[in-house]
Amino acid sequence: MKVQIKRLHPEAMIPERQTKLASGFDLHVLDAVLPENASDPYYDHFEAIRIFPGERILVRTGIAIQMGEGMEAQVRPRSGLALRHGITLLNSPGTVDADYTGDVGVILINLGDKHVDIRKKDRVAQLVFQPVFHQVELEERESLNETERGDGGFGHTGVNSQP
């Protein structure tokens, strides 16, 4: 399966798998901005941005992708950043639809208790490709069939098996 990729900036790094059987392609930082500056053009002299506890930033990768119908790309966190620094994705997974051809952005949030510097070329997320069922149609009904679970919501099936 082939996915087309385009550099939107000459310094953008093409995502790569780190091992042969890795599910995700690592996404690299081209630059990063605070949310209110998301529409700014790419910064030519970007080196790093400091993300403080509770703060969020938009990482721009400088790449765009084009997939075939029936696919989506998911932007997912990297476990090492989450474990060591409390850095994760605010909207995880982020969805890149098959018809979106703009910059593949990454919304990072610092859930840790210390600031973290996000530098140009850092690997901050991974891109995983998944099938999508576009032929699904929603059909409104007055009632739904009975199931064993019914409308039991969060925590309804229990937390652990201890008495």
UniProtKB/Swiss-Prot annotation:
Its EC number is 3.6.1.23. Substrate binds at R78, S79, G80, N91, T95, V96, D97. Keywords: Hydrolase, Magnesium, Metal-binding, Nucleotide metabolism. It comes from Heliobacterium modesticaldum (strain ATCC 51547 / Ice1). GO terms for molecular function: dUTP diphosphatase activity; magnesium ion binding. Pathway: Pyrimidine metabolism; dUMP biosynthesis; dUMP from dCTP (dUTP route): step 2/2. This enzyme is involved in nucleotide metabolism: it produces dUMP, the immediate precursor of thymidine nucleotides and it decreases the intracellular concentration of dUTP so that uracil cannot be incorporated into DNA. It is an enzyme of class 3 (hydrolase). This is Deoxyuridine 5'-triphosphate nucleotidohydrolase. GO terms for biological process: dUMP biosynthetic process; dUTP catabolic process. NCBIfam families: dut, PRK00601.1. The keyword DNA repair does not apply. Residues 140-163 are annotated as: Disordered. It catalyses: dUTP + H2O = dUMP + diphosphate + H(+). Pfam families: dUTPase. Belongs to the dUTPase family. Residues 140-151 have a biased composition (Basic and acidic residues). It comes from the Bacteria. Its cofactor is Mg(2+).
